[in-house]
Regions:
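A short beta-strand motif characteristic of beta-propeller blades
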Residues: 4-9, 45-54, 91-96, 133-138, ...
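WD40/WD-repeat beta-propeller blade-loop signature
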Residues: 16, 60, 69, 102, ...
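Conserved strand-to-loop turn within each blade of WD40 beta-propeller repeats
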Residues: 31-33, 76-79, 116-119, 159-163, ...
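WD40/WD-repeat beta-propeller blade N-cap
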Residues: 9-14, 53-61, 97-103, 138-145, ...
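Acidic and/or Ser/Thr-rich intrinsically disordered tails and linkers
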Residues: 1-19, 26, 318, 362
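Terminal intrinsically disordered, low-complexity extensions flanking WD-repeat/beta-propeller proteins
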Residues: 1, 249-251, 271-273, 282-362
């Protein structure tokens, strides 16, 4: 069973958004419509970071992602804007308005903020720049960009879209580049647009949101497809070759590796709405976690590698202990605070695990 269940009133049931993340400093961020909340696992305190509707009645949050330093949070909006927040001081330090449609996914690569949008573009921003923030643009998706992940060595970016495409971009490889027209004040005249990725992988037959790089095997990427695909595929991103394909029988919403790279967790939507634990490389399922009653659209992994948080359209957040505890990658804190058992929730949070929560071995 989950170690805790919280209410998440009003969380959006939208496959293309990314509304929850867990920082290296042990804080969970969750976006509920126009508001972003942060729960601190060390103190068990929950605070509202911001309400973006204060800047416009129709504004709401479409994505959140922590920087690697655990201090700054990138927040994407339905308007196409991206905000950078200093969470410790509760203040907005940057705002970029380059995209013309909603920003459904945000990713960090050190000081670079990478944003993906329904306008089909991926922008790389210098988070330190007060203006002309865009360093480069990747423009090859044909529909909304809903998945972004930089590789652990920071050289390759995997992007997934509603066009069923999985693209691999390499920041050391720059074919067919052209200058970006400087029609927008936020885009530097020297920024470049790249239209040809290193690899254009077309095997998925539905939207590609779920992306996860192996923490131990360089160039190994896991990707998951939507309702008409349902497959977890493994890729060698040095060659562009598919390593394996596993039909999960259900929409794949998220993927995350154990810290030692020997296990994988996936969350699912139509039709199972459950969480599956897999052995790698056999891709043999060894656990199924049930309890959510709608699509498990959002997943976040604790810094110690042991716990995952899942959020769904059923307006609950569930915390599960799924992997062996580890010291974590370099620069990450160790064990999750025992204060998890005294979790102080968002408004209307449950006191304990819901009655509908259950766990069963595969």
């Amino acid at each position: 069973e989950p170690v805790k269940v919280l209410d998440a009133p009003g969380i959006r049931d939208d496959y293309y958004l990314n509304l929850m993340d867990w920082s290296t400093s042990d804080q969970v961020s969750i976006a509920l419509n126009s508001e972003v909340y942060v729960w601190d696992a060390q103190s068990s305190q929950t605070n509202r970071l911001c309400d973006v509707s204060a800047e416009g009645d129709g504004n709401w949050v479409t994505s959140v992602r922590w920087a690697e330093n655990g201090k700054h949070l990138a927040v994407g909006l339905n308007t196409g804007a991206v905000q950078i927040w200093d969470v410790n001081h509760g203040r907005k330090v940057r705002s970029f308005s380059v995209h013309t449609r909603r920003v459904g996914v945000v990713e960090w690569n050190q000081a670079v903020v990478t944003t993906g949008s329904r306008d089909k573009r991926i922008h790389n921003h210098d988070s330190r720049a007060r203006e002309n923030s865009v360093i480069s643009t990747y423009y090859a998706h044909e529909q909304e960009v809903c998945g972004l992940r930089w590789s652990p060595d920071r050289t390759q970016l995997a992007s997934g879209g509603n066009d069923n495409l999985l693209l691999i971009w390499d920041n050391r490889y720059t074919p067919q580049e052209s200058l970006v027209p400087s029609y927008h004040p936020e885009i530097a005249p020297v920024a470049r647009t790249f239209r040809r990725p290193l690899f254009r992988l077309r095997d998925h037959t539905a939207a590609v949101k779920a992306l996860a790089w192996s923490p131990t095997q360089r160039g190994l990427l896991a990707s998951g497809g939507g309702t008409d695909d349902r497959c977890i595929r493994m890729w060698n991103t040095h060659t562009g070759q598919q390593v394996s394909c596993n039909d999960t029988k259900s929409q794949v919403c998220n993927l995350s590796w154990s810290h030692d790279g020997t296990e994988l967790v996936s969350t699912h939507g139509y039709s199972e709405n459950h969480i599956v634990l897999w052995k790698y490389p056999s891709m043999r399922p060894f656990g199924i976690l049930s309890g959510h009653t709608k699509r498990v659209l959002y997943l976040a992994h604790s810094p110690d590698g042991q716990t995952v948080a899942t959020a769904a359209g059923d307006e609950t957040i569930r915390f599960w202990e799924v992997f062996a505890k580890s010291a974590g990658p370099p620069g990450r804190p160790g064990a999750l605070s025992s204060s998890m058992s005294r979790l102080v929730g968002l408004p209307g949070s449950s006191a304990g695990a819901g009655k509908d929560a259950s766990a069963a071995a595969a």
